[in-house]
Amino acid sequence: MSVPLILTLLAGAATFIGAILGVIGQKPSNRVLAFSLGFAAGIMLLISLMEMLPAALRTDGMSPVMGYGMFVVGLLGYFALDKMLPHAHPQDLMQKNAKPTRGNIKRTAILLTLGISLHNFPEGVATYVTASNNLELGFGIALAVALHNIPEGLAVAGPVYAATGSKRTAILWAGISGLAEILGGVLTWLILGSMISPVVMAAIMAAVAGIMVALSVDELMPLAKEIDPNNNPSYGVLCGMSVMGLSLVLLQTAGFG
C-alpha cells in the first residue's frame, strides 16, 4: 500500500476520534474545537498558496493561464458543489445548551452525515493527489484534514446518539462520513495510479489548491467563529500557518524538501 493512500486512510479515520468523543461525554470545549478548525484552515491556506500552486506553475509545460485557470476552476467547483449539497449546521448541534427535539435531531443528523460525506470525498482526492506529488505537503494536508475531521465526527455522533441511544449506531454513522474521504483516496489511487503526466498532475494540484482555499475561507473559518463567537479564529489560522511553515522549512533543511 502506498504512503499517499495510507495518509488518506489515516486522515479519514480521524472522524472516529470525534465520534468516540461524541458518545463518551468527554466533549472538547467549543474554544478547543474552534481553534482546531482555525489551525486546520491555516495549514491548508499556507500549503495551497505557498507550496501547491507555485509548484504547479513551475512544472514544465504548465502555462500560467492554465495554472491559474485550474486554480479558479477549483474555487468555482467547490462553491458549485456547496450549493448543491444539503446543509445542516454542526455548530448548532455542538452547543452544550442546545436541546432540539428527538425527531429534529435524527433528521438533522441524516442531512449532516450526507452533507459531510459529500464534502469529504474531494478531500480524500486532494490528500492523495497532494501526497503523490510531494510527500511533505501530503503530510501537512493529511494533518489539516484529520484536525477538522474530529469535530465533524463529533457533530454527527452526538445527535445520532441522542436520537437512537446507541453508541454503536452513532459511531457507525459518523464513520460513514469518514469512509467517504477514504473512498475518494482509494478511487483516485485506482484510477490515476502512477499513469499520469506531470502536466496533468500539476493541473490537478492547482485545482486542489483552489478547493482547499475555498474550504478554508468559506467553511472552516466561519464555522470556527460560530462555534466560539467570543474568540477570534484568526489566532488558530495564524498558528496553523506558523507551525506548517516552520515544519516545511525544517524538512527542507533536513533534505526532505
From Swiss-Prot:
Binding site for Zn(2+): 123, 148, 152
TM regions (residue ranges): 5-25, 32-52, 61-81, 109-129, 137-157, 171-191, 195-215, 236-256
GO cellular component, one term: plasma membrane
Binding site for Fe(2+): 120, 123, 149, 152, 181
MF GO annotations: metal ion binding; zinc ion transmembrane transporter activity
Pfam families listed in its UniProt record: Zip
Reactions catalysed, as given in the entry: Zn(2+)(in) = Zn(2+)(out)
Topological type in the membrane: Multi-pass membrane protein
Compartments where located: Cell inner membrane
Sorted UniProt keywords: Cell inner membrane, Cell membrane, Ion transport, Iron, Membrane, Metal-binding, Transmembrane, Transmembrane helix, Transport, Zinc, Zinc transport
Chief subcellular location: membrane
Similarity field: Belongs to the ZIP transporter (TC 2.A.5) family. ZupT subfamily.
Entries under HAMAP family matching the protein: ZupT
Function noted in UniProt: Mediates zinc uptake. May also transport other divalent cations.
Name by which UniProt lists this protein: Zinc transporter ZupT
Gene that produces this protein: zupT
